Each structure stands twice: as structure tokens, then as C-alpha cells.
């Protein structure tokens, strides 16, 4: 879901 993407991006960024 979008939340998963946000969490992944937030983790990388």
C-alpha cells in the first residue's frame, strides 16, 4: 500500500 511505500522511502531518505 501507499503507507508501505512511504515507510520504505522514509527509511531510505
Curated annotation (Swiss-Prot):
Gene Ontology terms describing biological process: defense response
Alanine amide modification, residue list: 13
Record's GO cellular component terms: extracellular region
Location in the cell: Secreted
Tissue: Expressed by the skin glands.
Main location per the UniProt record: secreted
Free-text function comment from the UniProt entry: Has no antimicrobial activity. Inhibits the formation of NO by neuronal nitric oxide synthase (nNOS) at micromolar concentrations. Acts by a non-competitive mechanism, probably by binding to calcium/calmodulin and as a consequence blocking calmodulin attachment to nNOS. In vitro, does not exhibit cytotoxicity towards 60 human tumor lines.
Protein name: Lesueurin
Top-level taxonomy: Eukaryota, Metazoa, Chordata, Craniata, Vertebrata
Amino acid at each position: 500500500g501507499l503507507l508501505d511505500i512511504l515507510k520504505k522511502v522514509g527509511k531510505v531518505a
